[in-house]
Amino acid sequence: MRILAIDPAIRNTGYAVVEGDYRRARALDYGTLSIPRSVSQSGCLLAIKQHLGNLIDKWNPDEMAVERIIYVQSHQTAITMGAAKAAVVIAAAEAGLRIMEYSPKSVKLSVVGRGAAQKTQVAFMVRALLELRETPESDAADALAIGLTHLFSADPLKAHMMERKYI
């Protein structure tokens, strides 16, 4: 199975394309879509949607996995994060992709074994599990972890631990 995994944010959206199953996975592509502060919010949303559309065209994923927005610092941040996530969902919907959403705690539990793991621990485990040469930067590591979580969710021994839902 090939998964496009997204860690949505208005300025730095992490993305990853992972392939495999709950026993073995490999990273095909990953990175961060970084958008300068000079770009308007609407311009950011368009850039996110277009970038994801390009990734979908290039990699032809079977499904998409995204991180659920749980904690935000303010109402304005919640609105901005929601808009970024909407751009992600629209790109997936246009391509007819099924979208699965995972809580941050489920992602950490799946990849590290602790729901309260630190970002550095997640990045370390992503590097180890995918046998990457270098530790990915934070947003890309989060997207890779989301993709791994989706693949791991097919494991009957782990599926019960994950907070997930289709959107």
UniProtKB/Swiss-Prot annotation:
**Binding-site residues for Mg(2+) 2, renumbered to this chain:** E67
List the EC numbers from the record.
3.1.21.10
Please state what class of enzyme this protein is.
hydrolase
Q: Tell me, what is one Gene Ontology molecular-function annotation carried by this entry?
A: crossover junction DNA endonuclease activity
Q: Which domain of life is it from?
A: Bacteria
Cellular component, GO annotation: cytoplasm; Holliday junction resolvase complex
Q: Give cofactor(s), names only.
A: Mg(2+)
Cofactor details (free text): Binds 2 Mg(2+) ion per subunit.
Q: Which cysteine pairs are covalently linked by disulfides here?
A: none
UniProtKB keywords: Cytoplasm, DNA damage, DNA recombination, DNA repair, DNA-binding, Endonuclease, Hydrolase, Magnesium, Metal-binding, Nuclease
Catalytic activity reads: Endonucleolytic cleavage at a junction such as a reciprocal single-stranded crossover between two homologous DNA duplexes (Holliday junction)
User: What are the GO BP annotations of this UniProt entry?
Assistant: DNA recombination; DNA repair
- The active site consists of D7, E67, D139
Q: Where in the cell is it found?
A: Cytoplasm
**Annotated residues for binding of Mg(2+) 1:** D7, D139
PANTHER family xref list? CROSSOVER JUNCTION ENDODEOXYRIBONUCLEASE RUVC (PTHR30194:SF3)
Q: Which family does it belong to?
A: Belongs to the RuvC family.
Sum up the protein's function in the record's words: The RuvA-RuvB-RuvC complex processes Holliday junction (HJ) DNA during genetic recombination and DNA repair. Endonuclease that resolves HJ intermediates. Cleaves cruciform DNA by making single-stranded nicks across the HJ at symmetrical positions within the homologous arms, yielding a 5'-phosphate and a 3'-hydroxyl group; requires a central core of homology in the junction. The consensus cleavage sequence is 5'-(A/T)TT(C/G)-3'. Cleavage occurs on the 3'-side of the TT dinucleotide at the point of strand exchange.
List the HAMAP family hit by this protein, alphabetically. RuvC (MF_00034)
Subunit field text:
Homodimer which binds Holliday junction (HJ) DNA. The HJ becomes 2-fold symmetrical on binding to RuvC with unstacked arms; it has a different conformation from HJ DNA in complex with RuvA. In the full resolvosome a probable DNA-RuvA(4)-RuvB(12)-RuvC(2) complex forms which resolves the HJ.
Q: What is this protein called?
A: Crossover junction endodeoxyribonuclease RuvC
Q: Which species does the entry assign this protein to?
A: Akkermansia muciniphila (strain ATCC BAA-835 / DSM 22959 / JCM 33894 / BCRC 81048 / CCUG 64013 / CIP 107961 / Muc)
